[in-house]
Amino acid sequence: MKLVQLSRPIIRNALAQALLTAVALASAQAALAQQSDAAQQAPEQAPTTLDQVKVTGIRSSIQSSIDSKREQTVVADVLSAEDIGDLPALSIGEAIETITGAATHREKGGASEISIRGLGPFLGSATFNGREASNGSGDRSVNFNQFPSELINTVAIYKTQRADFVEGGIAGTVNMQTVRPLEFGKRRVQLDGRATYADGDSKLRNADGVGWRGTVSYLDQFDLRGAGKLGVSLGLQRLEGTNPEEVMSSSSTWTACNANEVVGASRNCTAVTPAQVQAGTPYYLAPGSRVYRQISEHDQRDAAFAALQWRPFDGLEVALDYQDSQRTVTEDRAELNFSETLRNLNNRQVGDNGALLGHTGSSTVESSTDYKVRDEQYRGGGLRVEWRPNAAWMLSTDLSYSRTERSEIDRLMRLRSNATDINGNRVPGINGQRVDYTYTYAGDVPGIVVDPAFDLNNPDNFSAAARARRDELRREHTIRAWRFDGAFTPESGLLTSIKGGVRLSEATYRDLDDRVERNVTDPATIRAANLACRQPFPQEDFLSSASGNTIQQWATFDSRCLFGAITGVDDTGRNADPRGTANSDVEEKTRALYVMGEFASTLFGLPLDGNLGVRWVRTDVSSVGLRGELDVVDNPDGTIQLVETGRFAAQTVRASNRVFLPSFNANIGLTEQTQLRFGLYRAMARPDLVALSAGRTFILEPGTEFTTVGEAIGSITATGNPRTQPLLSSNADVSLEWYPNADSLLSAAVYYKQFTGGAVPTVVDERFVIDGTAVVVPVVQDVTTRQKSDLTGLELTGTHRFSYLPAPFDGLGVKLSYNYADSNYKTQDLRLGDQIDPATGLVSSGIVAPANIFGLSRHVFSGQLYYAIGAVDLQAIYKYRSEYFQKFVGAPAQNRYVRDSGTLDLRASYRVNAQLSVSLEASNLTNEPRISDMPVPGSFREYNTYGRRYYLGVRYRF
């Protein structure tokens, strides 16, 4: 942590550093140019053959990436490798992080969702081999963990749009490309094995030990004589490993409490209204619960890739590819839950923005377990046919399919504190079922100190309100698409090509959320389960790297044992009728047409080329939601459940939109080494598919003392809004790029985006029949506005190899990238932000300040220092991202902010010979945690730590 904290002031000056680097590189190149002129004046000197030396490793990847960027017809950045498995990263997500302007959200310690130019994943698009790919999250991002990096050789980010690109990329489009076997041009069999180790595994009592990842790939070409040429690519991968986590977290529902009141010991704080806050009533922000969570995990992935490329004769090509990836993640969680943190809140210390920094309180304490199994399978592929009947015409068609199925089953158990233990003895330090505690936030994590008379480590003390839940979430996302493209090449004139095409796609998203619950209060049953399922705390040194932590362990129980002891079975299975009001059933049909012209000419004697086009897109949405009556079930602990009766009526909501997306890109060759690019375009970003859901979720207030069912229901939240319109953006980009030699690049880009559209929460009263009684409850959902907002940004990239230094320093090189973005976009908090009156259209002021646009980091920096000479490749990679707003995927929620973070990775490889190489890699050497706040910055929500990871690899090619 200290290393990262020291680096952050440097990062805040990253723009100045990048400019200084640019000047230094330019000066160095000027010196090189002078040396080159002097060399030309000495004809007796023998010509060098340096350019004929075969370049490999990281230097080869950088050269290939520079060449690819230079050849693009739009503003773009590319990470490319001539050979398979040569992308310099452990995963596709980590590879993308090194591309200028790209940043990732970290899950399980690795890169997941991609933000481009500081904009979240829903403002960008991601394609695999040029096609949309499904995922199991309900959003439009791509699960990069599903794709083995060893089988991908190019990742490109197109930052301006072209009419023939699939729509959706306001921020940009990420395209992952597998190798094309005929273009590869040689036979290759490759075996790649890596041993993996997470240092957090050493803390576990039941450690997984060393994991592994094995990949085998085969590429070949065949001459079929009269039937043309055939290329084949096959790849298989198996992965097994572990990703332990240590977490302190809070609930995702926050209340603005009246700071003038003294909260009684037997009740929750009183929420303030926006009108009270506007009138000067002070408030503080508090969650419904706090939880400590220890996670042991096992991860397994099997992947298979196949591609055929057939050229029966010149002018005709048929390509078929298929991908299959199945991943199973098994988690065993032990949790200590303070479930009533709105109760008896006093002696408060409050920050300027309402963040709660310290207080006393009383809460029920729960020892909980969760045995979670997630299975996710991706299947995708496509058939592409390209025909050139003559030199002037090219016709192509592409048929694709992508489907992801995710099943997530949680078996959750809870044992609560009580006035007496399992033997009937009075428990010291407890009042009723609640324990007094103090909360102090002064370190990395808050410290919670309970009454010292109450022993958190004594399992006897968790003797009440046993609850077993089986939650099952199933998601299915399918994309079917077809496109046809044609291109005509004129013999002469300004236009070098005229293109046009059509694309049809159908995306479906369905989810099912099922819960089976068993509540037990019988003391004998609870005592027997408690005694039978006790276990030692699963790890040592829990949250030892987090300053301020006060709880290192607590009484825990075997998750599967406890579930079986309470329910009588290992798995209850789901309900006979799993339908529910929260389920989603969304269908989205898209039709797109485009026409585009490519041109080449001169401007003031300088070469000019580019493209001009327009894309028309129509989107039709059909979303089905269920409405039905609910029964109230009283739990033995005094709380309630809302159980659907099974009598449902389907409501179908339909919506559509049409947009025109013009685009213009131009490239001016200022010199042989310098290019000036321009991009003007309009782009769209569709809402996530899950955000188009027509379902409803019920949020129950914590506690037991309510006079009516209406009081117990905190709110009903719409799972989405099918009428949500796409976010539109008018964009302008200018990029100046200098390519002094094969190892060097210096570029600067400025860009501007004006957004039209956004979302503001609205509250609509809806009538529900609950326990036979009509209850009117406010339903919160986002509605689309026509508000305008702006974003401006700057990108800097510098890549250089110091080949002019004396040996052995001539192998040193550096790659630096920096992105700055700023926007006045506003994302209102779902519960505490501005809200719009649906009847009048008037906006009422909220309590907390809005967040910016999803995923916006003002500063994103990536720095690589590498040493590549002979058979040795060494890399140090530092990645930094400033604070950003991160939405929850799957259902609307309040605003969450992820704090700034920086991670350091090291990689080393050695080529023993042309066939054999070995590598050693380490990630997150700074042991950087992920810390998030809600619903305002500085209001602690969660601390996740994953630890460092190490990889030892061997590769053999023949």
Located regions from the model:
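N-terminal periplasmic "start-of-domain" segments of outer-membrane beta-barrel proteins
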Residues: Q52-L87, E113, P121-G124, R131
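Extracytoplasmic beta-strand/coil segments of soluble accessory domains associated
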Residues: G93-E132, K159
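Transmembrane beta-barrel wall of Gram-negative outer-membrane proteins
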Residues: N206-R343, H359, E366, V373-N390, ...
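Solvent-exposed loop segments that connect transmembrane elements
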Residues: E246-Y292, D332-T369, M413-A468, V520-P536, ...
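Outer-membrane beta-barrel signature, preferentially recognizing the C-terminal barrel domain
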Residues: S363, S367-Y378, A582-K589, A655, ...
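Gram-negative outer-membrane beta-barrel transporters
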Residues: V750-F888
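C-terminal beta-signal and adjacent terminal beta-strands/loops
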Residues: L812, K879-V889, S909-F958
